[in-house]
Amino acid sequence: MNILKKFVVMISVLTLVLFGCSSGKYTDKIDKAVKLQEKKQTKIAKRDAGDEVKHFDKKDANIYVYDKGKYVILAYKPLSDDEEVHYYTYEFKGKKAKYKENFNSKGYYQEHDPDYKEENMR
């Protein structure tokens, strides 16, 4: 019985380690997309001076990674008095990230299964 307990504990620990590391694979890409979106949101807020959220905050956004890290989609509410969610896609080529301006981010999100997702939006 003692050997069985050790085996179950070992399997449980390995499972936790494997699931805990799944986001680590995309951490760099997510961080780059978040930094770019922070800059983008700050510019939008300065330019429009309306009800735009002043800063992008990762903890208020949903993050989706697709195609083995090729695309990172950030979904959040950029307007303080509006519940509409906006989707922003960053494409990665090598280590470089670029915002995809004329890309149907919401459609892509709806039609594809993410490799990784982090849903923080309230």
Predicted regions and their residues:
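Bacterial N-terminal signal peptides that target proteins for export
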Residues: 1-8
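Solvent-exposed, well-ordered amphipathic alpha-helical segments
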Residues: 2, 40-44, 122
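Intrinsically disordered, low-complexity segments enriched in glycine/proline and serine/threonine
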Residues: 8-9, 80
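Alpha-helical transmembrane segments
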Residues: 11-15
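C-terminal motif of bacterial Sec signal peptides marking the signal peptidase cleavage site
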Residues: 16-20
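Bacterial signal peptide processing site
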Residues: 22-25
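Post-signal peptide N-terminal segment of mature Sec-exported envelope proteins
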Residues: 29-48
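Extracytoplasmic electrostatic interaction patches
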Residues: 49-122
